[in-house]
Amino acid sequence: MASQLQVFSPPSVSSSAFCSAKKLKIEPSGWDVSGQSSNDKYYTHSKTLPATQGQASSSHQVANFNIPAYDQGLLLQAPAVEHIVVTAADSSGSAATATFQSSQTLTHRSNVSLLEPYQKCGLKRKSEEVDSNGSVQIIEEHPPLMLQNRTVVGAAATTTTVTTKSSSSSGEGDYQLVQHEILCSMTNSYEVLEFLGRGTFGQVAKCWKRSTKEIVAIKILKNHPSYARQGQIEVSILSRLSSENADEYNFVRSYECFQHKNHTCLVFEMLEQNLYDFLKQNKFSPLPLKYIRPILQQVATALMKLKSLGLIHADLKPENIMLVDPVRQPYRVKVIDFGSASHVSKAVCSTYLQSRYYRAPEIILGLPFCEAIDMWSLGCVIAELFLGWPLYPGASEYDQIRYISQTQGLPAEYLLSAGTKTTRFFNRDPNLGYPLWRLKTPEEHELETGIKSKEARKYIFNCLDDMAQVNMSTDLEGTDMLAEKADRREYIDLLKKMLTIDADKRVTPLKTLNHQFVTMTHLLDFPHSNHVKSCFQNMEICKRRVHMYDTVSQIKSPFTTHVAPSTSTNLTMSFSNQLSTVHNQASVLASSSTAAAATLSLANSDVSLLNYQSALYPPSAAPVPGVAQQGVSLQPGTTQICTQTDPFQQTFIVCPPAFQTGLQATTKHSGFPVRMDNAVPLVPQAPAAQPLQIQSGVLTQGSCTPLMVATLHPQVATITPQYAVPFTLSCAAGRPALVEQTAAVQQAWPGGTQQILLPSAWQQLPGVALHNSVQPTAVIPEAMGSSQQLADWRNAHSHGNQYSTIMQQPSLLTNHVTLATAQPLNVGVAHVVRQQQSSSLPSRKNKQSAPVSSTSSLEVLPSQVYSLVGSSPLRTTSSYNSLVPVQDQHQPIIIPDTPSPPVSVITIRSDTDEEEDNKFKPSSSSLKARSNVISYVTVNDSPDSDSSLSSPYPTDTLSALRGNSGTLLEGPGRTAADGIGTRTIIVPPLKTQLGDCTGATQASGLLSSSKTKPVASVSGQSSGCCITPTGYRAQRGGASAVQPLNLSQNQQSSSASTSQERSSNPAPRRQQAFVAPLSQAPYAFQHGSPLHSTGHPHLAPAPAHLPSQPHLYTYAAPTSAAALGSTSSIAHLFSPQGSSRHAAAYTTHPSTLVHQVPVSVGPSLLTSASVAPAQYQHQFATQSYIGSSRGSTIYTGYPLSPTKISQYSYL
């Protein structure tokens, strides 16, 4: 009588948990062989529950079938094929013995027509072989099945591949599960629900934890002696991992370990589906890169953690990467199965590790290995996801190394010579004068070993670069297609680094996380692409997450061993999981008594920004209790924070929901999308009065970066006095900065104002001189009487989310104030108050070719929300330095901080040594749309950026500026090569008067950015500021050059204009800077950083926005002169090395040091030698509010010292 196969039935095809096995399902329609695990055998189960089968008393008997019951014609005998069978599991540590046998394979006839040749679901994943026949699947590789004796087939399958209802150990050491059986530990009991899968060292069952009624997965290890040692290693590794945050580092959470009937049982969280089953469910179709990226990021994060612990997973493959919850958390994955894991110090060269398709060359060749083998496996996994088929599906190790060598070239000679197993696959060529290794031909290998080589590849590539051409999506076009091609280039670049044959040169998990494919900085060139937006949305799943039962206190259960009486064989060991701090912001931010947190009153959270940080999340980036000592409190209001947690420990931005453009104030709340260059949570702020309370210790030692808080006033008849609170930053190394508070600091801001809280992430840049650089904040009000609305300009740019890469540097997060999150913050306060027209019009104008505005001033939009600098060791995204020529009417000016020290420099200095007589002023001219325009100038100093050339968006080429003499600075026909190497970017004005269409057209708006060839400057000095149709950039001739660029305009003089004669010599003449007699604040920047940005932003005319930069939005209050305030305020943050001779020449420094960048301040604001006291209404009636440490050379109070103008005879 034929033996009956009794198997358990899972509820669905995709149900699996902590298992590395593929399922062989036996269904009436045919056999669906979905592969197998790293073990040498399969298991079978069925979805059908025949009602005619008998029921066992204590177990549920299912899927009973007789092989003889099948028609003999339904059994197809495959031709005899030679196979290699490794009797011992590869990763068991025991020696593998190879035997050769003729294996008869068995398949169901109806399955032949269902499987495509390339979709062989019965892929062997470790030591087994793949039959080359397209539809015949190998079921067993044990002694040949005797087809003439069906009972033998059933018996063999019963003992090796199927679980029965008997609850006893098999000869292989597997525990025989019984459904509804109770597995008991010392503290919990688990009921077996169903069989999930079989792995190398045991099997996995889905169980029900009775005490908590939760579903868990229990891995029951074999009790065979050969697996005992590896089982102990797995238990010890899981015990070590249990002290880490499993959700943060993306590996399976383990609960406890216990003994049941002499079998070690490991309890894990229940996961849904592995990647192989997911691919199979989708018919092995290629996975788009936007889905591969989050999987890669999460697995690389897990490998990064394992590497830091000195652990090797050694069996990374799609089967061991589990989808946590495909429905609610798409592409949220975790790494499972540490049964093959080992410590790097205990790695043995001769050990068989890894499934063959994902086996690193050093394992195949018998070389010493380390954690780098996991990176090779991960590269093979992401290649398989991309192709839908394994990249190197070798049927044997020879085929595996042959595939690798054909695509990537032979391993280096020194690797082949050092390998202990090299001679199995390579020969030395005796015909050459010196011995070189040569791969054996398939015939030679077959002759030596008797193993026939097979071809199982779906794609055969001559090199990995060819992968970019396959499976190109046909539904993408335009910018989406350009973004996809750019994404593929970065993907291939990373893949080649992961699949480097030499393990010493292979990319590490940390570098993988910082690669552009993961950080997506290359996609910033396509901000308007829906495809790119979906890429960023998919990476949301990579945010740090905290489990619901994590508590504030780290409660660690000890790893205990419960010694039971001799009558019991149970051994219980409890895995302790790190219960990290709950990021429940309401509770965390309320705990300001110990570590003062920032309590922000937020409401109407209709401004969304992607909370994705595209770098690794090291544990050292966690909040440091000694750092978060003080905070900023915005009151009154409830302690209501965003509903989401703050996984990246970032600062919040309090952003105004709307900026009124009418003549009277309004309370309408309308969320305004903000494009920031830093991924931080954005929430709108209600326009209610918000007092700012700044605690005295808000600045800590080494903190040099201010956080600017600006208040924007709507149109109201009267405005209460505003208070600017600049803090002295005496940033000498080792000296804490001091803040002197006055009554002005603690007075409430007036009602109806809107606050912008700008966090700073600039100190995260590595290599930045933090202790000697200050980014000051200046408020420069100019007279303005226009009623022109700014909504038109704002609408010129489409509003979308901009994302950036913020690489949190742990070394830079130690001495900075945090808002309960370890985000480095310093606070400086500045208010923007509009001032009525008070200055007289200029006495003369330049000749214009078209009607222009009566006055021209260099201005910056008030309340510009400046993008933060996102940085990683590989890329620094620049931000904006905003200067604006505004025509006809004047508006208050803010020159906020340049957010990034290593970014562009706007330098204003007087070259006292080689000053020439002709001084240049900013031109007051028009382009073609309107007067009363507001433009932005961004100066970047990286000459090697090709962002503008690769941009899919056109940039307008402007005609040259006209100077005082009416001559052109440069003709419109001049090529970009004639320009200078650096680049200045100006956002175009949308309304300018239509000027001459000839070459004499004047430009006050956009000067499109373009990569221009650097031109050597005269005598190694500064080549000045050259304005060309294609580039307007500050060129530094030498490492110590500092550029003159005037940022202000004397209202008493004529409208400033710039002119420069260009000769045939491409080297520009030396340009002089007109420096107004104004007080100036030194800006400190860094130029010589090796981490200087290589990809710089560039602006394009509206509506086509720059691909690599965030949108600049104008959050401006109405511009009617009747509703403007009459006073303004100024907040200066000075660096100690700032010279008091602000208008004088500044000492140049080596390129490795910071450069002084003095920024001029409008004459209507500060007292200076040339400005009458009546022109400046001092806003702070009484006491000085700037405190200074001893030894500082900066000003310590109002009024500021007058500018030394003795050097400027022309003023």
Swiss-Prot record:
Binding-site residues for ATP, renumbered to this chain? 196-204, 219
Bias (Low complexity) occurs at 1048-1064, 1096-1105
PROSITE patterns named among the record's database cross-references: PROTEIN_KINASE_ATP, PROTEIN_KINASE_DOM, PROTEIN_KINASE_ST
GO CC aspect terms: cytoplasm; nuclear speck; nucleus; PML body
Q: Where is this region: Interaction with TP53?
A: 885-1094
> What superkingdom does the record give?
Eukaryota
Q: How is it modified after translation?
A: Phosphorylated and activated by JNK1. Autophosphorylated. Sumoylated. When conjugated it is directed to nuclear speckles. SENP1-mediated desumoylation is mediated by TNF in response to stress stimuli, triggering transient translocation from nucleus to cytoplasm.
Q: What SMART domains does the database record attribute to this sequence?
A: S_TKc
One GO molecular-function annotation for this sequence? protein tyrosine kinase activity
State the active site.
315 (proton acceptor)
User: Catalyses which reaction?
Assistant: L-seryl-[protein] + ATP = O-phospho-L-seryl-[protein] + ADP + H(+); L-threonyl-[protein] + ATP = O-phospho-L-threonyl-[protein] + ADP + H(+)
Q: Where is region (SUMO interaction motifs (SIM)) located?
A: 902-926
Q: Where is the Protein kinase domain?
A: 190-518
Q: InterPro entries in the record, alphabetically?
A: Kinase-like_dom_sf, Prot_kinase_dom, Protein_kinase_ATP_BS, Ser/Thr_kinase_AS, Ser_Thr_dual-spec_kinase
Q: Where is this cross-link: Glycyl lysine isopeptide (Lys-Gly) (interchain with G-Cter in SUMO2)?
A: 25, 120, 124, 991
Where in the cell? Nucleus; Cytoplasm; Nucleus speckle
Tell me its family: Belongs to the protein kinase superfamily. CMGC Ser/Thr protein kinase family. HIPK subfamily.
Free-text function comment from the UniProt entry? Serine/threonine-protein kinase involved in transcription regulation and TNF-mediated cellular apoptosis. Plays a role as a corepressor for homeodomain transcription factors. Phosphorylates DAXX and MYB. Phosphorylates DAXX in response to stress, and mediates its translocation from the nucleus to the cytoplasm. Inactivates MYB transcription factor activity by phosphorylation. Prevents MAP3K5-JNK activation in the absence of TNF. TNF triggers its translocation to the cytoplasm in response to stress stimuli, thus activating nuclear MAP3K5-JNK by derepression and promoting apoptosis.
Its subunit composition reads:
Interacts with Nkx1-2, Nkx2-5, MYB, PARK7, DAXX and p53/TP53. Part of a cytoplasmic complex made of HIPK1, DAB2IP and MAP3K5 in response to TNF. This complex formation promotes MAP3K5-JNK activation and subsequent apoptosis.
Instruction: State the name under which the record lists this protein.
Output: Homeodomain-interacting protein kinase 1
Source organism per entry reads Rattus norvegicus (Rat)
Its lineage opens with: Eukaryota, Metazoa, Chordata, Craniata, Vertebrata
